[in-house]
Amino acid sequence: MFRLYVLVMGVSAFTLQPAAHTGAARSCPVRGRHYKREFRLEGEPVALRCPQVPYQLWASVSPHINLTWHKNDSARMVPGEEETRMWAQDGALWLLPALQEDSGTYICTTRNASYCDKVSIELRVFENTDASLPFISYPQILTLSTFGVLVCPDLREFTRDKTDGKIQWYKDFLPLDKDNEKFLSVRGTTHLLVHDVALEDAGYYRCVLTFAHEGQQYNITRNIELRIKKKKEETIPVIISPLKTISASLGSRLTIPCKVFLGTGTPLTTMLWWTANDTHVESAYPGGRVTEGPRQEYSENNENYIEVPLIFDPVTRKDLNMVFKCFVRNTMGFQTLRTTVKEPPPTFSWGIVLAPLALAFLVLGGIWMHRRCKHRTGKADGLTVLRPHHQDF
């Protein structure tokens, strides 16, 4: 997109000059190879889109740039003047029909008076045989026991501005009938619906689009290798924390984890989030004092858990009047748990005050008991001394 901007803006200050007389023509860097390789069948139409110019931008960009094609670093532009199978149109290079000898690297060059770059595209044309199938097939994956959709790929250049395109689908080279309850081709789209995907649905599929050009009909074939993956099990999520009331001192930093038990279920499709007074945390605390922490997924004893903490930095009196709720949802169920933040009870305790009094009471009581016992012992000793005198009398 940046290159397109430079190309368009460059014409506002410069008049487009012939390519041979510009500095850009003398130095035109190659930006690299397009990530996608084009694997096509011999005898069918091929359209190579210039990577620098998407179709939706062609109308606005085309008046300001010069677009050319070359093959295999050759100085000769394609298509040649006498070439009847190949032409350039709306930012794409068309080959109709394509031959194996057309295989190679095609370089799209875009330039104006002040800018120029090149991007290459790799094209390989295969003979239409079973041996070519692994090379030209698009891998697509559906999940077992679900409703799936296969897509006939890379047809945009041939279906653009056309509503009458008809696609015939095949499985293992056998046509899929219209009355087939398992497969349904959606008219006007490139989609094949697959009901209740089964393991035996795996294999090679072929979609064929009929394309008309100058009164002649051509087939455009795309092959798909369907792979089936097992459906990951899901269980009903259960929130096991937090507690209904959390104690925290004003001014302290607090983290309240919302921990969810999933058992053997997958955490990938389970959503977990917090609210404050039935509002998203980001909306309730736009300043970011209270936020959701990063999501954690882990296993304990071969059982899966997910956790999202609610972080207070710090706790203020406003938080004491809020109701916080943790929500969890997946395809099996939905659950919520509420919690509130409260100040801890005062640290003053009557036990601290009464403990010294109790100790003093015990000490005084001990002294009183000691004196009483000593007084009684003294009386007993006096009686013992008087007995002999009574006997003498």
UniProtKB/Swiss-Prot annotation:
Modifications made to the protein after synthesis: A soluble form (sIL1R2) can also be produced by proteolytic cleavage at the cell surface (shedding) involving a metalloproteinase.
GO cellular component term of the entry, any: extracellular region
Superkingdom assignment: Eukaryota
Protein name per the record: Interleukin-1 receptor type 2
Protein's organism: Chlorocebus aethiops (Green monkey)
Database matches in PANTHER family: INTERLEUKIN-1 RECEPTOR FAMILY MEMBER (PTHR11890), INTERLEUKIN-1 RECEPTOR TYPE 2 (PTHR11890:SF3)
PROSITE patterns cross-referenced by the UniProt entry: IG_LIKE (PS50835)
Domain Ig-like C2-type: 29-120, 134-221, 237-342
GO molecular function terms listed in the Swiss-Prot or TrEMBL record: interleukin-1 binding; interleukin-1, type II, blocking receptor activity
Leader sequence residues: 1-13
Pfam family, one: Ig_2
Function text: Non-signaling receptor for IL1A, IL1B and IL1RN. Reduces IL1B activities. Serves as a decoy receptor by competitive binding to IL1B and preventing its binding to IL1R1. Also modulates cellular response through non-signaling association with IL1RAP after binding to IL1B. IL1R2 (membrane and secreted forms) preferentially binds IL1B and poorly IL1A and IL1RN. The secreted IL1R2 recruits secreted IL1RAP with high affinity; this complex formation may be the dominant mechanism for neutralization of IL1B by secreted/soluble receptors.
Similarity remark: Belongs to the interleukin-1 receptor family.
Cytoplasmic side: 369-393
Subunit structure of this chain's protein: Forms a non-signaling receptor complex consisting of IL1R2 and IL1RAP.
Keywords: Cell membrane, Disulfide bond, Glycoprotein, Immunoglobulin domain, Membrane, Receptor, Repeat, Secreted, Signal, Transmembrane, Transmembrane helix
InterPro entries in alphabetical order: Ig-like_dom, Ig-like_dom_sf, Ig-like_fold, Ig_sub, Ig_sub2, IL-1_rcpt_fam, IL-1_rcpt_I/II-typ, IL-1_rcpt_II-typ
Membrane spanning stretches: 348-368
Residues that carry a glycan: 66, 72, 112, 219, 277
Record topological domains on the Extracellular side: 14-347
Annotated S-S bridges: 28-116, 50-108, 152-207, 258-326
